[in-house]
Amino acid sequence: MKFSQMRDVVAIAERGSLRAAARHLSLAQPALTRSIHELERELGIPLFERRARGMILTPMGEAFVRRASAVLSEVRRARDEVEQLHGGTRGRVVAGLSLAAHVALLPAALKPFRARYPQVQLHLIEGWYPTLEAGLKDGSVDFYVGPQHERSPAPELTQELLFENTRIVIGRRGHPLAHARSLRDLADAEWTTTSVTFKAEEELRELFEQHGLPAPRLAVQSQSALTMMVALANSDLLTMVPVQWTQFTPLSHALAPIPVEEILPAPSIVTVRRAGLPLTPAAEFLLDLMRRNVPRTSARKQRPSI
């Protein structure tokens, strides 16, 4: 089995066809076909089902790709780590960040990171755990920073608490309920949530129930944070978001918090990464920059392993 064959299989799996994979790899399509056929003969199994509109993995192919992706990621990391330890500034860092992490930790980290590693490609994924779990396991994602999930990470991953968090209610500036001071005052409001926040609808409903209030009326459910912000700025909708959103200057002219008296808890912000394997120097530097910029008012613990 050759390294190039693993690379070829992963490329086809990611792009869904020989033609697209060959274009991505800058290979002739017959050469790519020959590479896959040779590997399938060596393994004695079909890795793909050939269809008119492309190729899909067989169950055995899916298992192979999981392992091959991890190997490719480790080779990339090894190459990056050696170069960076030797004083080089090239490579790639892939970080999965929640909205709270984007707003609270990323802004202060970007400039010093780019100054230290100007040629490292930084790939930022907006998401949350556990949707990023597969990438963390196979090494295609270096680390995650975002809300702690109710389920503990997989055994091969390690979790570190960065800070405790809270939420706020926000709406457009000039909102009719801008002077509300309790959730009860907001009982008749209409709400919006976004699917990029884990369990947003469920947590909003549970919060109202805890205070003896009927479930809030969910009028708009968006697939992106941008859609939600546009909806908020152009309607009387409300939403509940991490308190870090108040630090996002581009929103301040259009949206404002509604300071209700109730404490609105939010999941702790954590980082998740693979256990037993060090990050590359560039990835570790970025994560350390984020640690240094943890909100000072937060109850932070010093790098425990959970």
Question: What role is predicted for each listed range?
Answer:
Residues V10-A31:
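Short helix-boundary/capping micro-motifs
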Residues R53, E83-H102, R116-V120, E164-T166, ...:
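Interdomain hinge and pocket-entrance segments immediately C-terminal to HTH DNA-binding domains
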Residues W128-V141, P147, T197-A256:
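Hydrophobic hinge/microswitch elements
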Residues P147-Q148, L177-R181, A189-H211, L279-D288, ...:
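Secondary-structure junction motif
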Residues E156-W191, S195-V196, R274:
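Flexible hinge/capping segments at coil-to-helix
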